[in-house]
Design a protein with these regions (language model features):
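Short, polar loop motifs at secondary-structure junctions
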Residues: 1-2, 151-155
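A short beta-strand/loop micro-motif in the catalytic core of glycosyltransferases
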Residues: 146-149
Length: 166
């Protein structure tokens, strides 16, 4: 059977450190992944679709997804010295991932301030300045109160944020 876009997630619920969702193919099953960012549901759906094609049961797929080992510093929660909760997504970042993480930060509930610390994204070639500056459109000062930038390429984002009055 050929997979189509008829395979999709429903009832997506984001928590502080995980996501729960259902899949239309198995509406009574709830899947959990130990990471934030609704974009990660699409990654999980790819794994679920492959599992389904290989006739792996939903129970086994659920267990594997719930226990997946994350790459260090990719959507990883870190505890700060004074009790801060830091979402670290600094390993080999790229514009698409950075935009998704900024969206996730804006959507996560918090009792404190949201602070973004962004460093240079490497290996972007001639498009580097434009791609760094493009992140400004994904930073809402009403939702992310402070932004700290590290690296020479991030000067492009700084210029773009200043033009927006940030």
């Amino acid at each position: 059977r050929q997979l189509t876009d008829d395979f999709y997630a429903t009832s997506v619920n984001q928590h502080e450190t995980s996501l729960d969702f259902k899949v239309n193919e198995w509406p009574d099953e709830e899947f959990t992944i130990p990471m934030v960012g609704e974009y990660n549901v699409n990654n999980a759906l790819a794994a679920i679709a492959v599992g389904k094609q290989l006739h792996i049961t939903p129970a086994h797929i659920k267990k594997a997804l719930k226990n997946v080992e994350l790459t260090e510093n990719r959507a990883e929660w870190v505890n700060g010295a004074q009790g801060e909760r830091i979402l670290s997504d600094v390993y080999n970042s790229n514009p698409t991932a950075a935009k998704q993480v900024l969206k996730t930060i804006e959507e996560l509930p918090t009792t404190g301030k949201r602070i973004a610390v962004l460093g240079d994204m490497l290996e972007l070639g001639d498009a580097s300045a434009r791609l760094h500056a493009s992140l400004a459109a994904n930073i809402d000062p009403k939702k992310i109160e402070e932004v700290y930038l590290v690296g020479t390429e991030m000067e492009n984002l700084q210029d773009a944020l200043e033009k927006q009055g940030y």
